[in-house]
């Protein structure tokens, strides 16, 4: 059997001597580290899209996008607009939470024009025939410095008349 080096004291280094409870602290910290990936797999930190649907006499608006995201995440928001009667000047107005500290990578199909309305993003979609579904996709990336909760209200207008409003909240984790 090999001789124990002079600098190793078995009672202290192998048996933990007076620090026997320290092993439970180390195991507890290791357990906490292991919990984070499990919570991510259970979608606690987001990424899976949630669908919100709002309906009125004139139109139905559906939004499918994650409500919880992490910094650096790439994701897509889908807006489905189905008018029950023709919309002459369809406009989608997005609250500041749709653009604040989020990078818009692409928007398809491109709106006919974009405007700013008191910090909100207005997307002019043009006319939409009754019964026809207009689908708008916006691809995002979450800026790493963005943390916290943001209002992501969406309102569908026909001209100056608000048709449908959906209230959503986006939670951004570090």
PLM feature segments, named:
Residues 129-147:
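Low-complexity, intrinsically disordered segments enriched in Ser/Thr together with acidic residues
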Residues 97-114, 161-162:
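Short aromatic-acidic-glycine turn motif
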Residues 169-174:
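Short beta-strand edge segments in extracellular beta-sheet folds
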Residues 146-160:
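Serine/threonine-enriched low-complexity regions used as flexible
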Residues 81-83, 140, 156:
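Hydrophobic beta-strand positions in extracellular immunoglobulin-like domains
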Residues 2-4, 12-56:
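A eukaryote-biased signal for short, well-structured alpha-helical docking elements
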Residues 117-131:
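Extracellular adhesion/glycan-binding regions together with long Ser/Thr-
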Residues 57-96:
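Short extracytoplasmic
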């Amino acid at each position: 059997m090999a001789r124990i080096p002079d600098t190793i004291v078995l009672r202290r280094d192998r048996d933990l001597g007076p620090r026997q409870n320290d092993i439970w602290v180390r195991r507890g910290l290791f357990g906490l580290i292991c919990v984070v990936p499990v919570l991510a797999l259970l979608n606690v930190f987001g990424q899976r899209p949630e669908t919100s649907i709002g309906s009125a006499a004139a139109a139905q608006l559906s939004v499918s996008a994650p409500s919880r995201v992490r910094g650096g995440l790439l994701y897509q928001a889908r807006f489905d607009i189905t008018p029950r009667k023709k919309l002459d000047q369809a406009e989608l107005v997005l609250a500041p939470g749709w653009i604040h500290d989020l990078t818009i990578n692409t928007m398809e199909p491109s709106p006919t024009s974009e405007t700013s309305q008191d910090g909100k993003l207005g997307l002019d979609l043009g006319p939409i025939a009754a019964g026809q579904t207009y689908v708008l996709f916006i691809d995002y990336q979450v800026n790493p410095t963005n943390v916290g909760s943001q209002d992501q209200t969406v309102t569908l207008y026909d001209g100056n008349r608000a048709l449908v409003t959906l209230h959503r909240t986006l939670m951004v984790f570090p």
